[in-house]
C-alpha cells in the first residue's frame, strides 16, 4: 500500500525538466556524488527517486493512465490489510490494468499536445501496431469498444458505488443543513414559548397578588363580624336584665306586633350582611391526567452496513432511507382545550346515568385520544356496555371514530377512544428510523404503525405466522401491503426472503415487477408473468408453493431438524430463504376459483410456518363466504380497517369496533398474544416512494442463481405429496449437466449445484433429489455429505443412456 501511494504521488509530481537528469543518471548511481550534484535541480517533490519513478511510469510504461493499476494495487493492499476476501480486490486490479492499457493506446492514436504524457512508450507501441493491422479508424473503434465493454461489465459496480456514495454524501449534507435549520426553528420557537411563559407567569403573579388582597379584606370583615357577635352575646343570654332599648342606635327600634314590648334587632343581622358570600361553583368532577406518549429512540438506518454480499457473492445494497420523504416539521402538541371539553361532555353524560368516575387519564395518539375512566366500585361494567350507543351519540363527531373498550385489558378502567382535533400524520420514514427496527433480531420484521401511546409497533411475520387483512374500499389495505413489503425490503437481502405476488386487480402490485431479478421467484409455465394476475394461474402458483413446502419438509426430515431456523443454522451453505405469499384480493379469487383457491391456502396456513412460508391475504369483503371458517381458524393474526357494519367487524376480528374506525389507515390489529384488538395508525407510503425503492433495487446486478419454484401439478391434481413424487419423474433440463458435475468433482451438495450451474435453492434441491432417484448419489444423512455412487464418467454415460 505504501509503495502504491508513493508511486501515485511521484507520478503526479512529474516535471518535464527532470527528464534530462534522469536519463543521464542510471539507477545504480542514485547514491553517487553525481546524484548529489543534480539533486538540487530536481522539481519532483520526492527527489531523485520520485523523479526516476515518475519518468519510468509516464515515459516508458503507459503515461498518466499508469495511475489506474497503481490504485488497483492500493485497493488490493487494503483488502489484505483488513483481511477481506481477495476476489473483489483482484477483480478491480485486473479492471484497472486493462483499462489503463486501453486508454494508453487511445491517447497514442490521438494527436493531442499531451498525447506523449498520456500514452507512454508502451501505449504508442500498441497504437502503432493497431493502426498498422486494422487501420486508424478501426483502431479507434476497437479501443472505444473495449473501453465501453470494460466499463459496463467490470467497472459498473465501482461507478455505481461511487455515484451512490457521492449522492449519499450530498444527501446527508442536505439532511444536515435541514437539521440545522430545524434546530434554529426549534430554538426560536422555544424562545418564543419562554417569552410567552414568562409573560403568563407575570400575569399570574399579579392576579395572585390581587387575590391575596381580596382574601385579607374578607378576613378583616369576618373578624369584624366575630367582634359584633361577642358584643351582642351578653344581651341575648342574660334573662334577668332586660335589653336596654335606649343604648341601641339612635334609630327607632322595630316593634314586634305580637308583643307589647319592643324587640332589639339581633347582632346576627349585621354578621350576615357584612361578609361577601362565596360564589357557588358547579361540580367539576375528577381532574384529568394527561399521560405522556412513548418516546421512541431514533436511529439512522443508513448508518448500518448498506453494502452486503449474498450467498453467491453478489454485491447488494440496501435502499437508502433518503428514498422516503421526511415527515413535516409540525407541532407535536395537542389541543388541551378540545380535550377538556371532550372530558366535560363525557362526564356530564355519565352523571345523567348516575355513573361516578373516580379518576380519568388521557393518552393522545396520532389521530385519537384514549380516555381511561376508573369507575366507582359499585358501578358494573355491564352498565357501561349497555350505554355504548348513548355515549357514542353524545360524543359523536363529524367523522365518527369513537370506540368503547370495557374494560381495558390489564386495568381496572374502561376506555373511550375519541378523535382529536389536530391529527398528526404518520409517514413510513418516521416508523423505520427507530432503534427497535434497526437493531431487531426478527426473522421477518414488519412495521405496523403507531399505537395510541405513539409507540412504533414492530412485529415478526414469522411468529404470526400468517396475516389476514380486511377493510372497505379506500380504508388503507393496499397502503398497508406496501408498508409490509417495504419493511422487508429495508431489512432483508434477496437471498433471505422471496415474494410470490398475486394481484387479481392487476395494478396494485405492478411496481414490484422491477424486483424480478432479486426478490421474485419464477414459476414453471409462468416465467413471463412475474406478478400473477390471472385467477387460474393464481391457483397454479399457490399449488407450486404447496409443492415447495412439501419439498422443504423432506429436506428437514433428511437433516433431522424441526424448522427452518434449525436447518439454516445446521446447513449454512444450503440455507433456505423465507417465502412470503401476498394475495391482494382474496374475494375475486374465491368468486372465480372457489374451492380450488381455498384448499392450497388452507394447506399453507396449516403447515407452512415451520418451513418459512408465510401468507399475507387481503380482501375488501370480510364476509363468511370469503373468509371461511377454515381460513379464519388458521390466521390468528388479523388486521381490520374500516368496515361497513358490526357483522363484518365480527367476521374478521370476532368482536365489533372496526365499523367505528376513521379510515385512511386507522386499523385494529388482533394477534394470538392479545385478548383484545389494538388500535394502530398505519403509516403512509406514496406510490412514488415505492417506485423509487423498487427502481433502486432493480438497477443493481441480478443474482447469479436463478430462483425457480417447483412445477405446479395439473388442474386435476390436488397438490398432494403423491402427485409431487409422480411429477418428479420428469427430469430437469440441467439434470445431465449436474450429474457430470457431481461425478467429475466426486462431491454432491446443493450448494455446489447452486454455485456452478447458477441454480436457485429450490431447483438445485430438486435436481439433487432426481440424482438420488437415478442412483447417482446416495440419500441425504442429516448434515453428512452425500456419497457419489458413480465413480467415473464412462459409467455415468452408460447410466444416462439406460435412463433415456
Curated annotation (Swiss-Prot):
Residues 714-723 have a biased composition (Low complexity). It comes from Chlorobaculum tepidum (strain ATCC 49652 / DSM 12025 / NBRC 103806 / TLS). Belongs to the FtsK/SpoIIIE/SftA family. Residues 453-650 form the FtsK domain. ATP binds at residues 474-479. Gene3D superfamilies: 3.30.980.40, P-loop containing nucleotide triphosphate hydrolases, Winged helix-like DNA-binding domain superfamily/Winged helix DNA-binding domain. The keyword ATP-binding applies. Consists of an N-terminal domain, which is sufficient for the localization to the septal ring and is required for cell division, followed by a linker domain, and a C-terminal domain, which forms the translocation motor involved in chromosome segregation. The C-terminal domain can be further subdivided into alpha, beta and gamma subdomains. The alpha and beta subdomains form the DNA pump, and the gamma subdomain is a regulatory subdomain. This is DNA translocase FtsK. The gene is ftsK. It is found in: Cell inner membrane. Homohexamer. Forms a ring that surrounds DNA. The chain crosses the membrane at residues 61-81, 89-109, 133-153, 158-178. It comes from the Bacteria. GO terms for cellular component: plasma membrane. Keywords: ATP-binding, Cell cycle, Cell division, Cell inner membrane, Cell membrane, Chromosome partition, DNA-binding, Membrane, Nucleotide-binding, Transmembrane, Transmembrane helix. Essential cell division protein that coordinates cell division and chromosome segregation. The N-terminus is involved in assembly of the cell-division machinery. The C-terminus functions as a DNA motor that moves dsDNA in an ATP-dependent manner towards the dif recombination site, which is located within the replication terminus region. Required for activation of the Xer recombinase, allowing activation of chromosome unlinking by recombination.
Amino acid at each position: 500500500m505504501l509503495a502504491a501511494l508513493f508511486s501515485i504521488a511521484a507520478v503526479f509530481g512529474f516535471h518535464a525538466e527532470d527528464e534530462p537528469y534522469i536519463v543521464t543518471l542510471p539507477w545504480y548511481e542514485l547514491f553517487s556524488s553525481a546524484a548529489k550534484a543534480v539533486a538540487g535541480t530536481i522539481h519532483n517533490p520526492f527527489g531523485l527517486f520520485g523523479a526516476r519513478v515518475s519518468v519510468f511510469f509516464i515515459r516508458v510504461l503507459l503515461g498518466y493512465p499508469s495511475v489506474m493499476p497503481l490504485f488497483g494495487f492500493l485497493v488490493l493492499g487494503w483488502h489484505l490489510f483488513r483481511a477481506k476476501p481477495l476476489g473483489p480486490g483482484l477483480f478491480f486490479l485486473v479492471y484497472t490494468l486493462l483499462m489503463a492499457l486501453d486508454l494508453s493506446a487511445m491517447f497514442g492514436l490521438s494527436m493531442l499536445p499531451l498525447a506523449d504524457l498520456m500514452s507512454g512508450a508502451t501505449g504508442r507501441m500498441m497504437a502503432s501496431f493497431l493502426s498498422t493491422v486494422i487501420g486508424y479508424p478501426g483502431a479507434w473503434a476497437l479501443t472505444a469498444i473495449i473501453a465501453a465493454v470494460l466499463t459496463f461489465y467490470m467497472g459498473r459496480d465501482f461507478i455505481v458505488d461511487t455515484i451512490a456514495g457521492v449522492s449519499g454524501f450530498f444527501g446527508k449534507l442536505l439532511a444536515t443543513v435541514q437539521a440545522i435549520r430545524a434546530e434554529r426553528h426549534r430554538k426560536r420557537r422555544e424562545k418564543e414559548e419562554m417569552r410567552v411563559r414568562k409573560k403568563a407567569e407575570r400575569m399570574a403573579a399579579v392576579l395572585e397578588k390581587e387575590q391575596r388582597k381580596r382574601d385579607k379584606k374578607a378576613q378583616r370583615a369576618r373578624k369584624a363580624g366575630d367582634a359584633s357577635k361577642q358584643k351582642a352575646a351578653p344581651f341575648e343570654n342574660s334573662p334577668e336584665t332586660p335589653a336596654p332599648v335606649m343604648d341601641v342606635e339612635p334609630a327607632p327600634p322595630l316593634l314586634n306586633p305580637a308583643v307589647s314590648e319592643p324587640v332589639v334587632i339581633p347582632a346576627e343581622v349585621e354578621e350576615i350582611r357584612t361578609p361577601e358570600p362565596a360564589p357557588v361553583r358547579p361540580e367539576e368532577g375528577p381532574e384529568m391526567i394527561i399521560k405522556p406518549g412513548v418516546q421512541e429512540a431514533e436511529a439512522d438506518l443508513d448508518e448500518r452496513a448498506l453494502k452486503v454480499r449474498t450467498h453467491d457473492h453478489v454485491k447488494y445494497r440496501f435502499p437508502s432511507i433518503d428514498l422516503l420523504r421526511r415527515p413535516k416539521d409540525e407541532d407535536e402538541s395537542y389541543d388541551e382545550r378540545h380535550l377538556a371539553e371532550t372530558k366535560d361532555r363525557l362526564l356530564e353524560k355519565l352523571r345523567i346515568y348516575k355513573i361516578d368516575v373516580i379518576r380519568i387519564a388521557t393518552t393522545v395518539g396520532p389521530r385519537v385520544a384514549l380516555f381511561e375512566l376508573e369507575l366507582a366500585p359499585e358501578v358494573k361494567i355491564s352498565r357501561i356496555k349497555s350505554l355504548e350507543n348513548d355515549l357514542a351519540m353524545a360524543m359523536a363527531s363529524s367523522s365518527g371514530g369513537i370506540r368503547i373498550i370495557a374494560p381495558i385489558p390489564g386495568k381496572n378502567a374502561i376506555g373511550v377512544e375519541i378523535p382529536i382535533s389536530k391529527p398528526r400524520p404518520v409517514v413510513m420514514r418516521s416508523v423505520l428510523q427507530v432503534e427497535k427496527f434497526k437493531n431487531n433480531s426478527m426473522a421477518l420484521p414488519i412495521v405496523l404503525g403507531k399505537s395510541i401511546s405513539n409507540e412504533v409497533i414492530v412485529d415478526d411475520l414469522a411468529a404470526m405466522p400468517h396475516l389476514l387483512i380486511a377493510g372497505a374500499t379506500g380504508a388503507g389495505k393496499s397502503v398497508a401491503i406496501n408498508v409490509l413489503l417495504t419493511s422487508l425490503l429495508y431489512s432483508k437481502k434477496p437471498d433471505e426472503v422471496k415474494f410470490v405476488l398475486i394481484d387479481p386487480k392487476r395494478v396494485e402490485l405492478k411496481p414490484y415487477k422491477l424486483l424480478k431479478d432479486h426478490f421474485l421467484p419464477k414459476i414453471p409455465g409462468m416465467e413471463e408473468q412475474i406478478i400473477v394476475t390471472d385467477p387460474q394461474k393464481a391457483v397454479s402458483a399457490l399449488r407450486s408453493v404447496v409443492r415447495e413446502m412439501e419439498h422443504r419438509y423432506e429436506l428437514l426430515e433428511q437433516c433431522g431438524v424441526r424448522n427452518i431456523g434449525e436447518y439454516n443454522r445446521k446447513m449454512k451453505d444450503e440455507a433456505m430463504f423465507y417465502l412470503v405469499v401476498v394475495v391482494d384480493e382474496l374475494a375475486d379469487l374465491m368468486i372465480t376459483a372457489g374451492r380450488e383457491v381455498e384448499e392450497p391456502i388452507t394447506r399453507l396456513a396449516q403447515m407452512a410456518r415451520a418451513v418459512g412460508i408465510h401468507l399475507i391475504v387481503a380482501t375488501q369483503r370480510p364476509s363468511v363466504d370469503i373468509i371461511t371458517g377454515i381460513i379464519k381458524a388458521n390466521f390468528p393474526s388479523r388486521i381490520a380497517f374500516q368496515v361497513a357494519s358490526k357483522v363484518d367487524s365480527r367476521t374478521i376480528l370476532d368482536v365489533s369496533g372496526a365499523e367505528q374506525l376513521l379510515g385512511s389507515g386507522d386499523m385494529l390489529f388482533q394477534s394470538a398474544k392479545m385478548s383484545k384488538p389494538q388500535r394502530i395508525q398505519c403509516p403512509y407510503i406514496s406510490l412514488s416512494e415505492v417506485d423509487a425503492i423498487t427502481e433502486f433495487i432493480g438497477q443493481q446486478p441480478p443474482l447469479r442463481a436463478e430462483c425457480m419454484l417447483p412445477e405446479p401439478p395439473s388442474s386435476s391434481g390436488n397438490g398432494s405429496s403423491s402427485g409431487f413424487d409422480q411429477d418428479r419423474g420428469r427430469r430437469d433440463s440441467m439434470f445431465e449437466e449436474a450429474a457430470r458435475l457431481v461425478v467429475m468433482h466426486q462431491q454432491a451438495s446443493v450448494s455446489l449445484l447452486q454455485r456452478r450451474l447458477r441454480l436457485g435453492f429450490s431447483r438445485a434441491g430438486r435436481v439433487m433429489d432426481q440424482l438420488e432417484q437415478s442412483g447417482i448419489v446416495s440419500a441425504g444423512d442429516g448434515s453428512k455429505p452425500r456419497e457419489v455412487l458413480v465413480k467415473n464418467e464412462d459409467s455415468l454415460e452408460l447410466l444416462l443412456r439406460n435412463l433415456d
